From Swiss-Prot:
It comes from Trichodesmium erythraeum (strain IMS101). Keywords: 4Fe-4S, Electron transport, Iron, Iron-sulfur, Membrane, Metal-binding, Oxidoreductase, Photosynthesis, Photosystem I, Repeat, Thylakoid, Transport. The cyanobacterial PSI reaction center is composed of one copy each of PsaA,B,C,D,E,F,I,J,K,L,M and X, and forms trimeric complexes. Binds 2 [4Fe-4S] clusters. Cluster 2 is most probably the spectroscopically characterized electron acceptor FA and cluster 1 is most probably FB. GO terms for cellular component: photosystem I; plasma membrane-derived thylakoid membrane. SUPFAM superfamilies: 4Fe-4S ferredoxins. This is Photosystem I iron-sulfur center. Apoprotein for the two 4Fe-4S centers FA and FB of photosystem I (PSI); essential for photochemical activity. FB is the terminal electron acceptor of PSI, donating electrons to ferredoxin. The C-terminus interacts with PsaA/B/D and helps assemble the protein into the PSI complex. Required for binding of PsaD and PsaE to PSI. PSI is a plastocyanin/cytochrome c6-ferredoxin oxidoreductase, converting photonic excitation into a charge separation, which transfers an electron from the donor P700 chlorophyll pair to the spectroscopically characterized acceptors A0, A1, FX, FA and FB in turn. Residues 2-31, 37-68 form the 4Fe-4S ferredoxin-type domain. It holds the Pfam family Fer4_7. GO terms for molecular function: 4 iron, 4 sulfur cluster binding; electron transfer activity; metal ion binding; oxidoreductase activity.
Length: 81
């Protein structure tokens, strides 16, 4: 099952989520929107197993990285019954 990984602009560029991911789904890319000059990116979402370790590792109060499991994605779009 496919999972969606969303990175929000509240990311502080700390790399905690990248280091927590056991399958290297995430990586850091340059970004001028924060002091660290980088933001998490999710180029390999097809490898995501939905463990949500990246969410747990995120130190921001806003959960800058979110994993939406297949059913959650469907429910959030209003397609689940």
């Amino acid at each position: 099952m496919s999972h969606s990984v969303k990175i929000y602009d509240t990311c502080i560029g700390c790399t905690q989520c990248v280091r927590a991911c056991p399958l290297d789904v995430l990586e850091m890319v340059p970004w001028d929107g924060c002091k660290a000059g980088q933001i998490a990116s999710s180029p390999r979402t097809e490898d995501c197993i939905g463990c949500k370790r990246c969410e747990t590792a995120c130190p921001t109060d806003f959960l800058s990285v979110r994993v939406y499991l297949g059913a959650e994605t469907t429910r959030s779009m209003g397609l689940a019954y």
